[in-house]
Curated annotation (Swiss-Prot):
Function: Located at the top of the head of the 30S subunit, it contacts several helices of the 16S rRNA. In the 70S ribosome it contacts the 23S rRNA (bridge B1a) and protein L5 of the 50S subunit (bridge B1b), connecting the 2 subunits; these bridges are implicated in subunit movement. Contacts the tRNAs in the A and P-sites.
Subunit and partners: Part of the 30S ribosomal subunit. Forms a loose heterodimer with protein S19. Forms two bridges to the 50S subunit in the 70S ribosome.
Entries under InterPro entries matching the protein: Rbsml_uS13_C (IPR027437), Ribosomal_uS13 (IPR001892), Ribosomal_uS13-like_H2TH (IPR010979), Ribosomal_uS13_bac-type (IPR019980)
Keywords per UniProt: Ribonucleoprotein, Ribosomal protein, RNA-binding, rRNA-binding, tRNA-binding
Designated name of the protein: Small ribosomal subunit protein uS13
Similarity remark: Belongs to the universal ribosomal protein uS13 family.
NCBIfam families (UniProt xref): uS13_bact (TIGR03631)
Top-level division of the source organism's lineage: Bacteria
GO MF annotation: an example: structural constituent of ribosome
Transmembrane portions of the chain: none
Species annotation: Phytoplasma mali (strain AT)
GO CC entries: cytosol; small ribosomal subunit
Listed Pfam families: Ribosomal_S13
Length: 127
Protein backbone atom coordinates (compact mmCIF):
# COMPACT_ATOMS: atom_id res chain seq x y z
CA UNK A 1 0.00 0.00 0.00
CA UNK A 2 1.22 3.46 -0.87
CA UNK A 3 0.93 6.39 1.50
CA UNK A 4 -0.22 9.69 0.02
CA UNK A 5 -1.26 12.70 2.13
CA UNK A 6 -1.12 10.55 5.27
CA UNK A 7 -3.55 7.95 3.91
CA UNK A 8 -2.79 4.37 2.96
CA UNK A 9 -4.32 3.96 -0.48
CA UNK A 10 -5.18 0.42 -1.64
CA UNK A 11 -2.67 -1.05 -4.07
CA UNK A 12 -5.10 -3.36 -5.88
CA UNK A 13 -7.25 -0.52 -7.27
CA UNK A 14 -6.82 1.85 -10.19
CA UNK A 15 -5.00 5.08 -9.33
CA UNK A 16 -8.00 7.32 -10.03
CA UNK A 17 -10.18 5.29 -7.63
CA UNK A 18 -7.46 4.88 -5.01
CA UNK A 19 -6.95 8.66 -4.79
CA UNK A 20 -10.59 9.07 -3.74
CA UNK A 21 -9.73 7.32 -0.45
CA UNK A 22 -8.12 10.64 0.52
CA UNK A 23 -10.64 12.96 2.19
CA UNK A 24 -11.15 15.99 -0.05
CA UNK A 25 -10.33 14.27 -3.35
CA UNK A 26 -13.19 12.92 -5.41
CA UNK A 27 -13.27 11.38 -8.87
CA UNK A 28 -13.03 14.73 -10.69
CA UNK A 29 -10.09 16.02 -8.66
CA UNK A 30 -8.31 12.69 -9.03
CA UNK A 31 -8.80 12.85 -12.80
CA UNK A 32 -7.49 16.43 -12.86
CA UNK A 33 -4.41 15.47 -10.84
CA UNK A 34 -3.63 12.55 -13.13
CA UNK A 35 -4.32 14.51 -16.32
CA UNK A 36 -1.72 17.09 -15.26
CA UNK A 37 0.79 14.27 -14.76
CA UNK A 38 1.08 13.07 -18.35
CA UNK A 39 3.25 10.00 -17.65
CA UNK A 40 0.61 8.30 -15.45
CA UNK A 41 -2.32 6.56 -17.11
CA UNK A 42 -5.65 6.77 -15.29
CA UNK A 43 -6.26 3.02 -15.61
CA UNK A 44 -2.92 2.02 -14.05
CA UNK A 45 -3.14 0.13 -10.77
CA UNK A 46 -1.36 1.56 -7.74
CA UNK A 47 0.82 -1.53 -7.35
CA UNK A 48 2.19 -0.94 -10.88
CA UNK A 49 3.26 2.65 -10.15
CA UNK A 50 6.93 3.44 -9.74
CA UNK A 51 8.20 5.40 -6.76
CA UNK A 52 8.81 8.48 -8.93
CA UNK A 53 5.14 8.46 -9.96
CA UNK A 54 4.02 8.32 -6.32
CA UNK A 55 6.34 11.21 -5.50
CA UNK A 56 4.89 13.20 -8.41
CA UNK A 57 1.33 12.57 -7.16
CA UNK A 58 2.30 13.56 -3.59
CA UNK A 59 3.92 16.78 -4.83
CA UNK A 60 0.92 17.61 -7.02
CA UNK A 61 -1.48 17.21 -4.08
CA UNK A 62 0.72 19.19 -1.67
CA UNK A 63 1.62 21.99 -4.07
CA UNK A 64 -1.67 22.06 -5.98
CA UNK A 65 -3.61 23.98 -3.30
CA UNK A 66 -5.86 21.01 -2.55
CA UNK A 67 -7.41 20.96 0.92
CA UNK A 68 -7.15 17.35 2.08
CA UNK A 69 -7.54 15.39 5.32
CA UNK A 70 -6.80 17.44 8.46
CA UNK A 71 -6.63 20.81 6.70
CA UNK A 72 -10.05 20.23 5.14
CA UNK A 73 -11.58 19.16 8.47
CA UNK A 74 -10.10 22.21 10.18
CA UNK A 75 -11.41 24.54 7.45
CA UNK A 76 -14.94 23.12 7.71
CA UNK A 77 -14.89 23.33 11.51
CA UNK A 78 -13.72 26.95 11.37
CA UNK A 79 -16.47 27.80 8.87
CA UNK A 80 -19.13 26.31 11.16
CA UNK A 81 -17.62 28.09 14.17
CA UNK A 82 -17.67 31.39 12.25
CA UNK A 83 -21.35 30.89 11.40
CA UNK A 84 -22.17 30.23 15.05
CA UNK A 85 -20.26 33.31 16.23
CA UNK A 86 -21.95 35.54 13.63
CA UNK A 87 -25.33 34.64 15.00
CA UNK A 88 -26.58 33.76 11.54
CA UNK A 89 -29.57 31.49 11.08
CA UNK A 90 -27.36 28.63 9.90
CA UNK A 91 -25.12 29.12 12.93
CA UNK A 92 -28.10 28.98 15.28
CA UNK A 93 -29.27 25.74 13.67
CA UNK A 94 -25.80 24.25 14.14
CA UNK A 95 -25.77 25.37 17.76
CA UNK A 96 -29.16 23.79 18.43
CA UNK A 97 -28.20 20.57 16.64
CA UNK A 98 -30.88 20.87 13.96
CA UNK A 99 -30.69 20.66 10.15
CA UNK A 100 -29.31 23.89 8.71
CA UNK A 101 -30.45 23.59 5.11
CA UNK A 102 -34.20 23.97 5.38
CA UNK A 103 -35.32 20.38 5.90
CA UNK A 104 -38.50 19.65 7.80
CA UNK A 105 -38.00 18.55 11.39
CA UNK A 106 -41.53 17.62 12.39
CA UNK A 107 -41.14 13.91 11.60
CA UNK A 108 -37.62 13.16 10.45
CA UNK A 109 -34.13 14.64 10.94
CA UNK A 110 -33.20 11.89 13.43
CA UNK A 111 -29.59 11.78 12.24
CA UNK A 112 -28.80 15.33 13.28
CA UNK A 113 -31.21 15.58 16.21
CA UNK A 114 -29.93 12.40 17.82
CA UNK A 115 -31.70 9.83 19.93
CA UNK A 116 -35.16 10.66 21.26
CA UNK A 117 -35.30 11.77 24.87
CA UNK A 118 -38.43 11.56 26.98
CA UNK A 119 -39.49 14.76 28.67
CA UNK A 120 -39.95 14.91 32.43
CA UNK A 121 -43.67 15.33 32.65
CA UNK A 122 -46.00 14.90 35.57
CA UNK A 123 -47.19 11.58 34.16
CA UNK A 124 -43.63 10.21 34.03
CA UNK A 125 -42.81 11.31 37.57
CA UNK A 126 -45.87 9.68 39.22
CA UNK A 127 -45.27 6.12 40.26
Amino acid sequence: MARIAGVEIPSNKRVVIALTYIRGIGIKKAQNILSDLKEIDINTKVEDLKEQHLIAIRNKIQNGNYLVEGDLKREVALNIKRLMENGSYRGLRHRKGLPSRGQNTRNNARTIKGKRRTKNTVANNKK
